[in-house]
């Protein structure tokens, strides 16, 4: 039996039909029909999130023009939304591979423990502290990946556990204390991570760069091709000799590093580290991924959708308050968005597969 993998297009999983089973379905060869199905499903989700983004933004502009026609609010979005958008982008790859990581908010805090330890122990070397934070994030992601792939426990269960484990470890290591980082504002690391470039917040610049890198990894690199096949059909991936365990572990490591970077940026921006950092980013990041068109079932995802989804979710909080509602509605709307997005993708997937 031979298996062929088509080139992965933006958001479309590779076709994994076997030549022996390339039967005609409604007059179309099976492999070609799968490719057409993936193409339609992908572009439907990307066009959908783009139209939703424009519609919601126009609604906010009409209902609250004083707020949403002021350039300052967009500078604010460019500073704050990347904190969860960066993680959502790498989380997209994890979900495409058929896994999920719910521990990233706690990894943000744990990585900052490494930052504080190096920064306080090496005469204020913020640049080395950033590298230490990234190393801790990578180690936390490696722990998740190994636990999931070697022990064989579902990622959902493992990362719920490590979310509490990493948060508890953070609290124990810093004894529940916060740390001021005011002196870090005069460093190169501060200017590179949360400064300004031509008036644009560096958080947004990094978010765009990471989005571009994620796109290249997911659609133009073997890692992304493997992730698509693993998420779409793990048995087929085994038959094709794809390194399933290594692929999944690498994606968890990348998400851990993204969480660490987001934690460092957040702490530098507010010039303070607090152990509960990242606690409010779980729902926004998940909502960005799913509303952006990534399938909860794995095998299909879109970086463009996640990027737009993150800024759509980031604008909802401000929009709710600007139109006169209280912030009590925020989590209600986040939860509703996740459920609706997952339901729509499930219905579309069943419809396209018929």
Please place each PLM-identified region on the residue numbering.
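Short loop segments and helix-boundary regions at transmembrane helix junctions
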Residues: 35-41, 95-100, 121, 138-181, ...
């Amino acid at each position: 039996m031979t298996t062929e993998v088509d080139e992965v297009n933006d958001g479309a999983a590779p076709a994994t039909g076997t030549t022996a089973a390339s039967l005609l379905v409604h007059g179309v060869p099976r492999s070609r029909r799968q490719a057409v199905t993936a193409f339609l499903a992908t572009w439907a989700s990307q066009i959908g999130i783009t139209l939703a983004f424009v519609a919601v933004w126009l609604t906010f502009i009409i209902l609250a023009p004083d707020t949403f026609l002021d350039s300052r609010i967009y500078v604010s979005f460019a500073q704050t939304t990347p904190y969860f958008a960066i993680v959502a982008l790498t989380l997209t790859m994890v979900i495409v591979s058929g896994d999920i990581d719910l521990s990233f908010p706690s990894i943000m805090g744990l990585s900052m423990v490494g930052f504080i330890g190096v920064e306080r122990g090496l005469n204020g070397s913020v640049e080395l502290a950033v590298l230490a934070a990234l190393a801790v994030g990578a180690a936390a992601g490696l722990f998740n990946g190994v636990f999931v792939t070697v022990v064989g426990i579902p990622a959902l269960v493992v990362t719920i556990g490590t979310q509490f484990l990493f948060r508890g470890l953070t609290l124990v290591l810093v004894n529940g204390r916060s740390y001021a980082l005011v002196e870090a504002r005069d460093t190169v690391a501060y200017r590179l991570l949360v400064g300004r470039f031509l008036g644009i917040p560096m958080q947004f610049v990094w978010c765009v760069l990471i989005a571009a890198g994620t796109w290249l990894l997911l659609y133009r690199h073997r890692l992304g091709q493997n992730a698509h096949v693993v998420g779409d059909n793990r048995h087929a991936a085994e038959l094709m000799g794809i390194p399933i365990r290594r692929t999944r572990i690498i994606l968890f490591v990348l998400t851990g590093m993204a969480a660490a970077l987001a934690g460092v940026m957040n702490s530098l921006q507010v010039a303070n580290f607090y152990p509960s950092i990242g606690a409010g980013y779980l729902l926004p990041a998940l909502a960005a991924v799913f509303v952006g068109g990534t399938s909860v079932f794995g095998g299909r995802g879109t970086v463009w959708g996640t990027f737009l989804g993150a800024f759509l979710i980031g604008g909802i909080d401000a929009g709710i308050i600007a139109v006169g509602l209280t912030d009590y509605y925020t989590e209600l709307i986040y939860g509703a968005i996740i459920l609706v997005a997952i339901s729509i993708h499930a219905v579309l997937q069943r419809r396209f597969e018929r």
